[in-house]
């Protein structure tokens, strides 16, 4: 996905101090952000001009100790054709020499009101999510108790209907039919809807419904961390399904492994309640409580007592 300077401005509500349409249309190619303190001191080894340049209180205070000519020389060296933009944090005053060098080198100058660390974190979060490589998977993503659950299964098995029931039970729809997944950082998988399908759910016999319009803003999310995969399968008498919770199945998406639970579907079974229970049980395991282990311990104790008798 291409991220432009204007997209960053709109997302973080930054002020454009200098920059025309052409400069704001520049592509940001990396999520890495540079704070050019060493460069201001004249050290340019390993300098990465393709990064966003963030000026905070430390850099700004150091600039104040320089003469006007030195300030201009610093920015003339920092600003390159491939530099997307420079952002000044805390609403600090923009030095005239910075503006002059930016105009001469074609670099947008932006200003943010937040602290430097807050602004840096917001930019990194946004850029990491937007620039990450994406994979589209078939399924429905629902946020259940703050945990993203990817529901998969054959076409027509009832994934969307199950998601609708979960929404009615107070959970939140993230994506239906197509889920775009990406690894935001090592070991963390996120999912979001395709833009054209945002907040929409397709129900056979009814058609497409807008979940946000029908159930309100609290019934949807734009993205969620995917932590569990539920696979709905047609119930077959000769098929063996896990009954004790011993299964350690996993699926791998974008290099991240997440647990996978197979749930049989048959007439009269309330699948949404089962999925809700599976999500809560998984969270309980993450917190250190394992009902399967508790059952095994009780069974072992019972066998030991019977053996003694």
UniProtKB/Swiss-Prot annotation:
Q: Where is this region: Important for the catalytic mechanism of dephosphorylation?
A: 264-269
Gene Ontology molecular function: any one: phosphorelay sensor kinase activity
Region span, Important for the catalytic mechanism of both phosphorylation and dephosphorylation: 201-210
- Which cysteines are cross-linked by disulfides? none
Q: Which cofactor does it need?
A: Mg(2+)
Catalyses which reaction? [HPr protein]-L-serine + ATP = [HPr protein]-O-phospho-L-serine + ADP + H(+); [HPr protein]-O-phospho-L-serine + phosphate + H(+) = [HPr protein]-L-serine + diphosphate
Q: One biological process GO term for this chain?
A: regulation of carbohydrate metabolic process
Any Pfam family hit? Hpr_kinase_N
Which amino acid positions bind ATP, per UniProt? Answer: 153-160
Where does the record place the catalytic residues? 138, 159, 177, 243
The catalytic activity of this protein is classed by the Enzyme Commission as 2.7.11.-, 2.7.4.-
Among Gene3D superfamilies, the record links this protein to: HprK N-terminal domain-like (3.40.1390.20), P-loop containing nucleotide triphosphate hydrolases (3.40.50.300)
The protein's UniProt keywords, in alphabetical order, are: ATP-binding, Carbohydrate metabolism, Kinase, Magnesium, Metal-binding, Multifunctional enzyme, Nucleotide-binding, Serine/threonine-protein kinase, Transferase
Chain's role? Catalyzes the ATP- as well as the pyrophosphate-dependent phosphorylation of a specific serine residue in HPr, a phosphocarrier protein of the phosphoenolpyruvate-dependent sugar phosphotransferase system (PTS). HprK/P also catalyzes the pyrophosphate-producing, inorganic phosphate-dependent dephosphorylation (phosphorolysis) of seryl-phosphorylated HPr (P-Ser-HPr).
Q: What family is it from?
A: Belongs to the HPrK/P family.
Other facts noted in the record for this chain: Both phosphorylation and phosphorolysis are carried out by the same active site and suggest a common mechanism for both reactions.
User: What does the subunit comment say?
Assistant: Homohexamer.
Q: Domain annotation text?
A: The Walker A ATP-binding motif also binds Pi and PPi.
Give the protein's recorded name: HPr kinase/phosphorylase
């Amino acid at each position: 996905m291409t991220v432009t300077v204007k997209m960053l401005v709109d997302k973080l509500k930054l002020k454009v101090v200098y920059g025309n349409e052409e400069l704001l249309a520049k592509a940001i190619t990396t999520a890495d952000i540079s704070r050019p303190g060493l460069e201001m001191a004249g050290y340019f080894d390993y300098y990465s001009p393709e990064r966003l340049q963030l000026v905070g209180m430390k850099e700004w205070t150091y600039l104040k100790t320089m003469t006007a000519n030195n300030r201009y020389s610093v920015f003339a060296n920092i600003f390159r054709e491939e530099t997307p933009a420079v952002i000044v944090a805390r609403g600090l005053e923009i030095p005239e020499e910075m503006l002059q060098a930016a105009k001469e080198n074609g670099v947008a100058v932006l200003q943010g009101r937040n602290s430097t660390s807050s602004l840096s974190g917001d930019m990194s979060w946004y850029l990491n999510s937007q620039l990450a490589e994406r994979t589209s998977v078939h399924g429905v993503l629902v946020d259940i108790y703050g945990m993203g659950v990817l529901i998969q299964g054959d076409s027509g098995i009832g994934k969307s209907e199950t998601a609708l029931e979960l929404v009615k039970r107070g959970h939140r729809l993230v994506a239906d039919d197509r889920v775009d997944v990406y690894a935001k950082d090592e070991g963390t998988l996120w999912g979001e809807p395709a833009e054209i399908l945002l907040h929409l759910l397709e129900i056979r016999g009814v058609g497409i419904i807008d979940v946000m319009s029908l159930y309100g803003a609290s019934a949807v999310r734009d993205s969620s961390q995917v932590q569990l995969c539920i696979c709905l399968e047609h119930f077959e008498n000769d098929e063996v399904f896990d009954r004790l919770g011993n299964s350690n199945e996993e699926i791998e998406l974008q290099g991240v492994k997440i647990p996978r639970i197979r749930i049989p579907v048959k007439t009269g079974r309330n699948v949404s309640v089962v999925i809700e229970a599976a999500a809560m049980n998984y969270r309980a395991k993450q917190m250190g409580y394992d009902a399967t282990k508790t059952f095994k311990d009780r069974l072992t104790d019972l066998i030991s007592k019977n053996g003694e008798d």
